[in-house]
Design a protein with these regions (language model features):
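Alpha-helical transmembrane spans
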Residues: 28-78
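Phosphoinositide-binding peripheral membrane targeting modules
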Residues: 136-138, 148-193
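Short, surface-exposed charged micro-motifs
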Residues: 141-143
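C-terminal structured domain segments
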Residues: 186, 191-212
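Canonical phosphoinositide-binding patch of PH/PH-like domains
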Residues: 205-225
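Short, Lys/Arg-enriched N-terminal segments with co-localized hydrophobic residues
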Residues: 4-21
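N-terminal topogenic membrane-targeting module
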Residues: 17-31, 64-135
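Pleckstrin homology
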Residues: 222-241
Length: 241
C-alpha cells in the first residue's frame, strides 16, 4: 500500500546544474519523416532550365539543394537522441532525494536501483533507428531507494521535443509489495503512407497488495533483470524478518 504520493507538471522546469538544456526543435527533426520529393523536382527543373538559361538553372539548383538540406541538415542521429536523454538523467539521484525529502543515509539498505526507457504509448512519436532500436519523444525513469521498513520511489517523465516534465513519488512498505518483474508489451510506429508496423518491448513492473503498480519500459533488459534480482532478494529478506 502506498503511504505517500504527490506530483506536478511544470512546463518551465529549470535545468539542474550539470544538465545540458534540450534542443527541442532539433530533436523534433529526428521524428519527422524525410521528404526529398520537392527538392529533387526543383533540382530537375533547374537542370532543364540550365541548358537554355544558365543563370535561371543555377538559381533553380540552389533552391532545390536548399530544400533538400532543410530535410536532412541538422537532423540528430540515434546516438544524439540517446545522449540527450542521458544528459537529462545525469542528476536524477540528487533530484530524487530532494523530491522525496530524504538524506542518503536514511535509505542505505542497498544502493538505489533505477529503470529507464522510452515511452511507447499512443501519444508518443516513435521511430525505428538505423540501429534497429525504437525511440520516442517521451522518456521515463524510475528510481527506488531502500530504507529499513520502506521502499521510496521517484518517477520522472519528460519530453525531448517540448518543455514538459513530470515528477511523482510513492512510498511502499516491504510487506505490501507483491511482485517485481519484467514483462513484454507491444506498440506500433508509422512507416509512412498511413501504414504502421508493430514491435515488442520489455518493461519493469512493481505490484502491491492494494492493486497499485509502477511500470517503466527498460532499454537494457539484462541490467534490469540484475536489478530486479537484487530487489527481490531484499524484499524477501524483509518479509521474513
Amino acid at each position: 500500500m502506498a503511504v505517500a504520493t504527490y506530483g506536478f507538471d511544470n512546463e518551465n522546469h529549470k535545468t539542474m546544474k550539470g544538465e545540458i538544456r534540450m534542443d527541442y526543435a532539433k530533436n523534433k527533426k529526428y521524428f519527422q519523416p524525410v521528404n526529398l520529393k520537392l527538392g529533387i523536382i526543383v533540382c530537375i527543373i533547374g537542370l532543364i532550365l540550365f541548358a537554355a538559361t544558365p543563370i535561371a538553372g543555377i538559381v533553380g539548383l540552389a533552391i532545390g539543394a536548399f530544400l533538400i538540406y532543410l530535410q536532412v541538415g541538422g537532423r540528430p542521429s540515434d546516438s544524439d537522441i540517446d545522449a540527450a536523454v542521458t544528459s537529462q538523467l545525469s542528476n536524477m539521484k540528487a533530484r530524487a532525494l530532494k523530491k522525496l525529502g530524504l538524506d542518503e543515509d536514511e535509505v542505505s539498505e542497498i544502493a538505489p536501483i533505477s529503470f529507464d526507457g522510452y515511452v511507447y504509448n499512443k501519444s508518443a512519436s516513435i521511430k525505428k533507428g538505423k540501429d534497429d532500436k525504437y525511440r520516442s519523444n517521451k522518456y521515463q525513469a524510475v528510481m527506488f531507494f531502500f530504507s529499513s521498513n520502506e521502499v521510496h520511489c521517484y518517477t520522472y517523465d519528460f519530453s525531448i521535443t517540448e518543455s514538459s516534465q513530470k515528477e511523482s513519488t510513492d512510498v511502499y512498505f516491504y510487506k505490501d509489495i507483491v511482485s517485481v518483474s519484467t514483462q513484454t508489451d507491444g506498440s506500433e510506429y508509422s512507416v509512412g503512407k498511413g501504414k504502421s508496423s508493430q514491435f515488442d518491448y520489455e518493461y519493469f513492473k512493481l505490484t502491491t497488495t492494494g492493486g497499485t503498480s509502477i511500470s517503466c519500459a527498460v532499454r537494457n533488459i539484462d541490467d534490469a533483470q540484475r536489478s530486479i534480482n537484487g530487489m527481490r532478494a531484499l524484499i524477501k529478506s524483509k518479509k521474513m524478518a
